[in-house]
Amino acid sequence: MSAWIGWKPRSCDPRVASSRLRCLGPLAELQSRGYPVELFEPRHLDRYAAIVYSKVYDDASYHQALELRRKGSRIIFDLCDNHFYNPRSLKYWEEARERLRRMMTLADALVASTEALAETMQRELAPDRAITVIGDPVETAIDNYPMPRWRRWLALRQWASVLAKLKVDQNQGRTPLVWFGNHGSPYAEGGMLDLQRIRPVMEQINRQYPISVTVISNSRWKYERSIKPWALPTYYLSWHPATFLHAVRAHAIAVIPISHNPFTLCKSNNRLALALHEGLAVVADMIPSYREFGKACCLGDWEAGLKRYLADPHLRTAHVALGKAIVDDQWSMPRVADRWQKLFDRVLAKNNIASAPHPKDRAGLSYREL
């Protein structure tokens, strides 16, 4: 058996954020270092010393992992969402919970995207199980995945239309705000409709400080029904890798309202960190993973936070600079890949298999095991 690691995400679709953040991005970074890791390939089962199952715990994957473990491979299971949360007591998610617990019990190493999620996972396991916390990296480039040309053309055309409207607004003194993210989940509250909670504040502030709101998401229907009727200019842009980061950078402030429940409280800091890294001030609701950015954004008080930023561009600039420093120190792709590499080295060492040499000694690894 060689020292190779196979990484199996739930989806290889680059439009799925968890696929990029929990597999494709770190994998590409590690491959650029010459580290022996690849996207899982069934034809290469005999070469894998370890396999990462990223949010994958269906029956077929479980039995595959069971057989690979019997043959000596190490199993790593990574989770980035609280799939134990089932507020509607749906049968599907009750069964999924059992499958998830089964996969975690089988795994030799467990990874969670946040400390809150690690604590949730811990409650489902034996008290002595260790869980490694490896957060999401901040992406600096997304438009390097293959996409149909016609989709790219359509996305660029749509973005040009929105950008033209933003320029007109800015010439009229409007400050552009943005919300971006998945429109929502079928099994937990949250997503685009969280904006409804701050609608009264936004409409009131718009009378004093003219603003616009752009929604970058994956449900125009939900936007048309719930956001477009607001009493201020709003725009919709379908998420696409060719336009997303350009669109985010065209705004001044990101708004991230979050309904508190066991699902959202386990989410990572990725949206907040990405917005700060791209130069936007951020007003958001507090969740545990946002705590380290508390001095680089406005958390919790929507009216006061928005008014502070709209009245004081210099404060926005100062907070963005502080936020970027935190991201560069802790949440860049190379830094997060370091944590994955350290985990893989440890797992391979238990099999008495040497990993590829580190291209360079990286200081200041932020690695923690709960």
Give the residues covered by each predicted segment:
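A charged, aromatic-enriched C-terminal amphipathic alpha-helix characteristic of glycosyltransferases
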Residues: 311-349, 363
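Carbohydrate-associated surface elements
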Residues: 116, 137
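Conserved catalytic-core segment of nucleotide-activated headgroup transferases in glycan assembly
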Residues: 6-29, 139-250
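Active-site proximal beta-strand in glycosyltransferases
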Residues: 51, 68-84
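Membrane-proximal helix-turn-helix segments that form the acceptor-binding/catalytic region
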Residues: 93-110
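A short beta-strand/loop micro-motif in the catalytic core of glycosyltransferases
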Residues: 51-52, 105-115, 132
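Nucleotide-sugar-dependent
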Residues: 85, 187-193, 241-242, 246-247, ...
